[in-house]
Amino acid sequence: MHDHIARAMAVKGKIRAVACVTTNLANDICFLQGTSPIASIALGRALSGAALVGSTLKQGQRTAIKFEGGGPLKKLIAEVEWDGAIRGTVAVPDAVAESVPAALGRAGFLTVTRDLGMKDPYTGMVQLYTSEIAEDLAYYLTDSEQIPSAMGLGVSLADDGQIAVSGGFLIQSLPPSDEAAVDQIMTTISKLPPLTTLLKDGTTPQQLLDILLEGVEHHPLESTNLFFRCGCSRDKVERALLSLGKAGLERMIEEQGEAAVTCEFCKQQYRFERSELEALSRSY
């Protein structure tokens, strides 16, 4: 099944529902990151979570989620762009833990940044609620963005350590709320088989939405393909080096003679010889 996100509206626009499959891009990203089993599960969930949280993006917009905690993973980042491009990284990819909450740590913060093309991006932050990625994202959406939300995320690993399935769903109640419909959907969610079981059985995102919204009037909206794309470039790295200032560049030239910058997302390395650093320094 190709990676994509499906959308639906229910009860005359009072309920928004989205579901996604991210198996292939999660495997690509985890391979680049060199993740341990628990890091693969955590990162896979975060990638799906970012896709769901960013499901309403318009052209040129971007959403990023960042989990920071005291556990062995330290930091987890997933970003999605309006066209379905996703990337992610984990600070300690070889972390070992018995569960995702243990890997993240009970104390920490979730930061959500929405770049909507305005002068400054909007950033919201909450303390980690349970350190379960789906629950923390739903808590953030409900508490900070004032949109009652329910989210489910699932990742299952194959015997060889690769991701067998990865995906999730997000249900949001929009004003004016239809409490009867919300209660019915929450009852359906409570009786839902494990999400990874549904995904292993080949359930598509649209079929998952039909299951979640059974008995509730709903209609499908557009779907979007999801895929891995980093977006880093030599020009962006040059701008980052220029941000060091003339003094910072001269110090780098004196102490190191060259620069090697590795993208934390795709691991592409960009090298700058002394002459290139000197040219950047002279641009001030």
Curated annotation (Swiss-Prot):
CDD domains: Hsp33. GO terms for molecular function: protein folding chaperone; unfolded protein binding. Under oxidizing conditions two disulfide bonds are formed involving the reactive cysteines. Under reducing conditions zinc is bound to the reactive cysteines and the protein is inactive. It comes from the Bacteria. One of its GO terms (biological process) is protein refolding. Disulfide bonds join 230-232, 263-266. Gene3D superfamilies: Hsp33 domain, HSP33 redox switch-like. GO terms for cellular component: cytoplasm. Keywords: Chaperone, Cytoplasm, Disulfide bond, Redox-active center, Zinc. The keyword Chaperone applies. Pfam families: HSP33 (PF01430). Its main location: cytoplasm. It is found in: Cytoplasm. Redox regulated molecular chaperone. Protects both thermally unfolding and oxidatively damaged proteins from irreversible aggregation. Plays an important role in the bacterial defense system toward oxidative stress. Belongs to the HSP33 family. HAMAP family: HslO. NCBIfam families: PRK00114.1 (NF001033). This is 33 kDa chaperonin. It comes from Trichlorobacter lovleyi (strain ATCC BAA-1151 / DSM 17278 / SZ). The gene is hslO.
